[in-house]
């Protein structure tokens, strides 16, 4: 996926039962349990050094999760190019004319074919795939997840409920949880703060800067591909829980998740930024 995994030696774990037992023993010795694996990326990118590699990583992650006895695997739907000859991924967010609708129809055909295969692989491995509704993915809202799931008759594909990605879109998170119901397979507790910049930028802001020159502060999104620099006065920003929404909000969130599945793990997503360090 996007981020290397030095904490999880995939090659060794794939080939050695002893290595798998030793690896899981690290957590058991500390009375901990792995709630899931993560292989977020763009397995459908037309970039030759991204899409094929991320798809390969996902297939292996499904197999590895099954071998480790880990049920949940967080991933992303990915975004294909606009057509079969496209060089770059194309994220359509407002298909107000026929051209964008044609792009979406092509992308759906690519996404559906790929994820039908992943669903079968997940069923064979006894693994549940939890799609993160993340920006720059074809599946990024509760509604288009449900449309997607119906098209492919998804059995082992659901949602990773990370509310931070729905907050910046202006959604009612509780309503989203109620709509998705038992399609929610996994939960990330991560917050988003809405900032004054939203007044003039809106939520679909393209004022990002170039990749930082300093390699120590770059965030990798693929082989030799990195995140752009965040705007200096953004409309919104991802933050640790409590820095965007208060205790009452998070209490209601947890209650809504409990109503869907009382045994659901709540996986806190820790974020570090230079802004946080200055506070």
Give the ranges of each region predicted by the language model:
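Conserved active-site loop/cleft motifs that coordinate metal ions or position small ligands
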Residues: 186, 264-271
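Conserved small/polar residues in nucleotide/adenosyl-binding loops
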Residues: 272-278
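A short, acidic, amphipathic alpha-helical segment used as a generic capping/interface helix at domain edges
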Residues: 245-259
